[in-house]
């Protein structure tokens, strides 16, 4: 039962975070947002194809195929070993998250939705990056800006 709750929450969080990426790109078109949106789209399509095509992945691991952060850099493991394309997606997402941190710290531009859903999206798996991201915000953003973010529960 708990596995299904985690699965449903993961799918909802991933979907909402993707929607926020779309809105973020629509409201403020820039290269980082475009690359992030493109990578999200490619990884979602690839995950769906991989989930549908790989019969060697068990039911639990099918969920992991949908959520890179649940299994980290190793990704889904089938009979042939770890999926090499998964590592590419994982590393690309790691670079994009780092670019997001730079965007916030240098440009000091981040929507409350972006930060909130980054936190939600990372809560189930690789929360370390999200914690570093939020801790960096707390330490380096101007106090008034962080207070505005804190009002929204971040």
From Swiss-Prot:
Record's keyword terms, sorted: Membrane, Transmembrane, Transmembrane helix
Residues in the signal sequence: none
Transmembrane region(s): 5-23, 34-50, 88-107
Membrane-topology descriptor: Multi-pass membrane protein
Main localization category: membrane
Gene Ontology CC annotations of this record: membrane
Domain of life, source organism: Viruses
The protein's name in its UniProt record: Putative membrane protein ORF51
Organism: Ictalurid herpesvirus 1 (strain Auburn)
Gene (UniProt): ORF51
């Amino acid at each position: 039962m708990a596995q299904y709750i985690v699965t449903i929450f993961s799918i909802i969080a991933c979907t909402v975070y993707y929607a926020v990426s779309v809105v973020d790109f629509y409201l403020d078109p820039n290269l980082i947002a475009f690359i992030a949106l493109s990578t999200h789209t490619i990884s979602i399509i690839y995950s769906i194809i991989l989930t549908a095509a790989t019969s060697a992945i068990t039911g639990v691991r099918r969920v992991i195929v949908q959520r890179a952060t649940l299994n980290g850099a190793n990704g889904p493991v089938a009979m042939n070993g770890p999926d090499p394309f998964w590592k590419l997606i994982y590393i690309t997402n790691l670079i994009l998250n780092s670019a997001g941190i730079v965007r916030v710290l240098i440009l000091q531009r981040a929507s409350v939705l972006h930060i909130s859903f980054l936190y939600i999206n990372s809560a189930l798996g690789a929360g370390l990056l999200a914690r570093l991201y939020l801790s960096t915000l707390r330490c380096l953003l101007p106090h008034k800006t962080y207070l505005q973010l804190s009002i929204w529960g971040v």
